[in-house]
């Protein structure tokens, strides 16, 4: 065994034990009833995990143990029991995290290249809405796809990635070229107007930005307001200057598409979540990848820095929440949080609690320190929840569901206070935003190519922004200025900047 490869174990006082899948549970029961020893296959799986566990050094220390990027980091060790990666269950998917006295958690590697993960758990009856409904993502046993061509977020819940017929009436009428960016695959920036003159107090399209080669899956302004980050199914995150929307940096290290990313509070780092099952930390200025965190056994769909930027929480299709130490990259907590893929995770303003949403129809609020579940929010329709975030003051939650609705929750009362309707959202996981600088508004994209702005108080639509020709997956509002950024599915994979007059 390579002496540089070491087993990395999370603290033993983590209070949560992962729930085995039905197949695993029945296997454990049969083994205990017959008083048999641990099967040889499980011993080999444990050896495989030990063989691939890598202790990553603190940020700033060279990661000499990592193999070159052009070499496979996961050669089959001697005695590896599963020679085919195309069978139904990969050993990383069936190896439960505390099998028969083994350490509570080993930081597992991602599946070997070319392997398409499969779901192994069955959802509780009735939690996914209408009978027979199930999100048809690439990670599902009912759907196959080429994950290298799209990210999970840009894939429809019905298993299609094609655009939905838009109803667009307003389109750019002029294009002004600006100076080319620095690198040879230069993103280009243009300034555009719209066909009708906007009224005072309304948003208008002021700029379009081209740079990504595939669908734009996530857009977020930095906390300082100086930068705009955009993530895509093309495996890259790009950083732009918000003053003139010129290109600054490309963050490229992931092997598959980007589903989400989070800015650190000082706007110097970005944590990213990808289909390649890893979470990475990037230095925004240099563009260097400082850390790769391995542990998730399926697509990582969402991630979030805590307000202190000392921890990163991530979640995804393995239905667990993992909390990572920013400085060391070690997993300090693993929570089996939901019974279906987790679609978003958010810390409140003080970092004491975090919220998660899932296709199981539940929103859960967690104590960030202990990992205990404080509250479970479920509405009567049980629609799959695709997004959740705390309000700026931390008192409320905003959620998005696959029933074309947004809901404002009071976590203490465990029920929705207000409903926001008017957009179309039946297939994709769309981001939504609460904007105080813009006048206490809620902003969301729509699958018909529009962006809707609601009044938080009155629930009325105050403006509809038209310009995209495909579903708008990602929106965000500037922390201090009256600016909205939006992006959507290819072929209309450009970023649009909207400003209020």
UniProtKB/Swiss-Prot annotation:
Compositional bias ranges of the Polar residues kind: 22-35, 167-177
Protein name in the entry: WD repeat-containing protein wdr-5.3
WD repeat residue numbers: 211-241, 253-283, 295-325, 337-367, 381-410, 422-455, 467-499
InterPro entries: G-protein_beta_WD-40_rep, WD40/YVTN_repeat-like_dom_sf, WD40_repeat_CS, WD40_repeat_dom_sf, WD40_rpt
GO cellular component terms, A-Z: axon cytoplasm; cytoplasmic microtubule; kinetochore; microtubule associated complex; MLL3/4 complex; neuron projection; neuronal cell body; nuclear envelope
Source species, domain of life: Eukaryota
Keyword Repeat: yes
Pfam families per record: Beta-prop_WDR5
Keywords: Repeat, WD repeat
Gene: wdr-5.3
Annotated knockout phenotype: RNAi-mediated knockdown does not result in detectable defects in histone H3 'Lys-4' di- or tri-methylation in embryos or adults germ cells at 20 or 25 degrees Celsius.
Function of the protein: Not required for methylation of histone H3 'Lys-4'.
GO molecular function terms noted in the UniProt entry: dynein complex binding; microtubule plus-end binding
Sequence segments annotated as region (Disordered): 1-35, 58-85, 155-197
Native species: Caenorhabditis elegans
Similarity comment text for this entry: Belongs to the WD repeat WDR5/wds family.
């Amino acid at each position: 065994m390579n002496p540089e490869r070491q087993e990395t174990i999370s603290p033993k006082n983590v209070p949560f034990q992962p729930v085995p899948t039905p197949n695993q549970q029945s296997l454990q029961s049969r083994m205990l009833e017959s008083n048999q020893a641990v099967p040889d296959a499980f011993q080999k799986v444990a050896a495989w995990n030990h063989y691939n566990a890598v202790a990553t050094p603190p940020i700033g220390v060279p990661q000499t143990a990592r193999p070159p990027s052009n070499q496979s980091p996961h050669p089959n060790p001697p005695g590896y029991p599963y020679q085919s990666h195309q069978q139904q269950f990969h050993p990383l998917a069936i190896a439960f995290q505390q099998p028969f006295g083994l350490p509570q958690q080993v930081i597992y590697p991602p599946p070997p290249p070319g392997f398409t993960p499969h779901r192994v758990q069955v959802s509780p009856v009735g939690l996914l809405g209408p009978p027979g409904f199930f999100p048809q993502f690439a990670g599902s046993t009912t759907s196959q796809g080429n994950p290298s061509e799209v990210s999970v977020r840009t894939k429809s819940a019905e298993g299609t990635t094609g655009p939905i017929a838009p109803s667009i009436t307003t389109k750019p009428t002029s294009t002004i070229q600006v100076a080319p960016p620095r690198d040879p695959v230069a993103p280009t920036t243009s300034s555009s107007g719209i066909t009708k003159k906007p009224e005072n107090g309304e948003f208008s399209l002021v700029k379009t930005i081209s740079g990504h080669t595939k669908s734009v899956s996530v857009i977020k302004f930095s906390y300082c307001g100086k930068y705009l980050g955009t993530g895509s199914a093309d495996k890259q995150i790009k950083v732009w200057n918000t003053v003139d929307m010129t290109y600054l940096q490309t963050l490229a290290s992931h092997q598959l598409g980007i589903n989400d990313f989070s800015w650190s509070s000082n706007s110097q780092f970005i944590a990213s979540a990808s289909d390649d099952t890893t979470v990475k930390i990037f230095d925004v200025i240099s563009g260097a990848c400082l850390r790769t965190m391995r542990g998730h056994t399926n697509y990582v769909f969402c991630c979030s820095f805590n307000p202190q930027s000392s921890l990163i929480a991530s979640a995804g299709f393995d239905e667990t929440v993992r909390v990572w130490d920013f400085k060391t990259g070690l997993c300090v907590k693993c929570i089996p949080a939901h019974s279906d893929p987790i679609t978003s995770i958010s810390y409140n303003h003080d970092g004491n609690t975090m919220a998660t949403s899932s296709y199981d129809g539940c929103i859960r609020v967690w104590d960030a320190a202990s990992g205990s579940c404080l509250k479970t929010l479920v509405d009567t329709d049980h629609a799959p929840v695709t997004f959740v975030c705390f309000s700026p003051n931390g008192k409320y939650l905003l959620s998005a569901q696959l029933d074309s609705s947004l809901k404002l929750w009071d976590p203490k009362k465990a029920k929705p206070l207000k409903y926001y309707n008017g957009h179309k959202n039946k297939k994709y996981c769309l981001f939504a935003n609460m904007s105080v600088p813009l006048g206490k508004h809620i902003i969301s994209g729509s699958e018909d190519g529009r962006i809707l702005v609601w009044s938080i108080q009155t629930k009325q639509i105050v403006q509809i922004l038209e310009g995209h020709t495909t579903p708008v997956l990602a929106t965000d509002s500037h922390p201090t200025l009256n600016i909205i950024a939006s992006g959507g599915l290819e072929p209309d994979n450009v970023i649009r900047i909207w400003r209020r007059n």
